[in-house]
Amino acid sequence: MSLSPKGNQPKRYEGDYFLKVDYRGGEALSEFLISLFLESTSFKDFVPYRYIFPNISKSPSYKPRYSFIPMFHIVLEYIYQFNSTLFDKVNRQNVRKSSEDRRMLVFRYWIDKYYFRLSIKDRVKELQNMIVWFTNGQVSYDDCATYFSAFVTLDTMFLNTDRHFQNFGVMFDSTLGSYRTSLLFDQGFSLGVGENSLFIKRVQLHRDKQIKMQPFGTTLKSNSKVVEWYPYDFDVVKFVNLLQFELSNWGVLGMSAQWGLMKRQLNIYYPQDTNGVNTLEYLTSVGL
């Protein structure tokens, strides 16, 4: 269970937009394709990404209206409130380490000695409890269930192996003065990005128990079993229209490993889209 992202992508703000440069290679295109999938549904709670050839993703900044509080921070706040002796113990034993290093040690202790000892179903409940507590009930258990369902379903379909405690959580809406579940973001390590040929082989052979995934269980199968499947109403015609508008050179897709894998996953989960259109046939008919 990782505590930080796989890649350390160079990032910068450019006006009201946030730009990320590929670190492993392929992250930007994956972010873009997953974003177009979401935009082809009625789901609204996500950060949209655009692709700048060859290796940059561009998204509107959710700041200053929203501030993101990762699950990592919520867990530490909960531990400090209900088990402050653990903080005291770690601080005494690691006086020469930085405060951030000590926070990581506390978190790691919680992961190893508590979180991993829970059933996967109980891990989900524990994180929901923490979110409801942290937000004073402004985010409900039903809100948490819908949110967890949305990102686990998305990650399962498109094989995002990097959903960690720093990229899911809650947001504070300064306009409304209240908390909400976070917008979905950070799907760059989907569609095989950062993985080796063994990973792709396991995907092709449907070996779901061998595909490593986070954050509740450690595999694709264990994660998807503990939450409800989110009913994304995918519209393949809308997807293609968006792709035509946003990507002038479709040759980029043909040169990428991600597009072939995305078509495969769409065919598995959406052999027919929400309107009854055969997804793979339609993509093929327009040259994709």
Question: Where are the regions that the model predicts?
Answer:
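Short, hydrophobic/amphipathic alpha-helical patches that form generic packing surfaces
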Residues: 33-37, 150-159, 281, 285
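Short, structured coil/loop segments at alpha-helix boundaries
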Residues: 62, 76, 80, 137-144, ...
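Conserved ATP-binding subdomain of kinase catalytic cores across diverse folds
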Residues: 1-115
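Extended low-complexity intrinsically disordered regions
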Residues: 92-132, 207-229, 237
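C-terminal catalytic region of ATP-dependent kinase domains
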Residues: 39-41, 173-288
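Conserved kinase catalytic-core segment
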Residues: 26, 122-196
